[in-house]
Amino acid sequence: MTKSTKILGLIGRAVDYSYSPLIHNTACRLLGLSYHYTVFNIADPSMIPDALRGAKALGIAGFNVTIPYKKSVVPFLDALSAEAASIQAVNTIVNEGGKLTGHNTDIAGFAAPLLPYRESIRGKTLSIFGAGGAALAAIEAFIRFFSPKEILLFVRNPEKASLLLEESGHDKSAPVRILCSDNPEIIRECRVIVNATPIGTRGNNDSPLPLDRELLHPGQIVYDMVYNPLDTPLLLAAQKAGAATISGIEMLIGQAEHSFTLWTGMQMPVKAVKESLLQEIQQ
């Protein structure tokens, strides 16, 4: 690092496990860019306003934002991109001369690994477990790119999820049905199953699966947003059942690629970065 090095970082809580520093620092090194990406753990949502004011004062170039702050940062930003405004959730912040603009690259990042399946997904019933910012991004991606018959949102608290959708400015004409996660029998008819919860994350003490493994079958695509471990309990169960699987690493790289371009104006060398990331994970 030098005096001219620009600082980037990840805003989250207890996210030292994140691979985002490796991804972005590798990309910057390969392209010869003078940036350094680090982690900013924020213990409580009440500290978010001070953190963002400090970022302006210190000239920090930008952030990624992860659980549980993707919605918490929104009121304290100066502007939102169309994508971020559409779901009132932010995963990327760009500091342009003291103006903080929130973006959401999760939408495009989530959609990217599903695009090869687009024709087989159109008009089908799709499902998501979870009701946070990541789930909202998945809903928006499904609607924008895949024209589903219906999106089933499995949650622990349907009333809270309904309020979250309403607050996000969600299009009420979209085919979203909220269901309690303790009764997912209908999952059998879903073409795509997405885990947008922390269930399965290394060190998470919840049940390792968001659904009964007996509901999985070869006609499904199972997409786990969790990326640590690489082979989550859900993905292993899905593979055993003969379903197609998508690792959270794909979304992690996809959203990171778009964030990187917003900050630097450059294209991320995705292939080389992904190779470096997988090598690190497998060690």
UniProtKB/Swiss-Prot annotation:
GO terms for cellular component: cytosol. It catalyses: shikimate + NADP(+) = 3-dehydroshikimate + NADPH + H(+). Pfam families: SDH_C, Shikimate_dh_N. InterPro entries: Aminoacid_DH-like_N_sf, NAD(P)-bd_dom_sf, SDH_C, Shikimate_DH, Shikimate_DH-bd_N, Shikimate_DH_fam. The keyword Oxidoreductase applies. Pathway: Metabolic intermediate biosynthesis; chorismate biosynthesis; chorismate from D-erythrose 4-phosphate and phosphoenolpyruvate: step 4/7. It is an enzyme of class 1 (oxidoreductase). GO terms for molecular function: NADP binding; shikimate 3-dehydrogenase (NADP+) activity. The keyword Membrane does not apply. Keywords: Amino-acid biosynthesis, Aromatic amino acid biosynthesis, NADP, Oxidoreductase. It comes from the Bacteria. GO terms for biological process: amino acid biosynthetic process; aromatic amino acid family biosynthetic process; chorismate biosynthetic process; shikimate metabolic process. NADP(+) binds at G130, A131, G132, G133, A134, M225, G248. Its EC number is 1.1.1.25. Shikimate binds at S18, Y19, S20, T66, N91, D106, Y227. The active site is at K70 (proton acceptor). Belongs to the shikimate dehydrogenase family. Involved in the biosynthesis of the chorismate, which leads to the biosynthesis of aromatic amino acids. Catalyzes the reversible NADPH linked reduction of 3-dehydroshikimate (DHSA) to yield shikimate (SA). Homodimer. This is Shikimate dehydrogenase (NADP(+)). The gene is aroE.
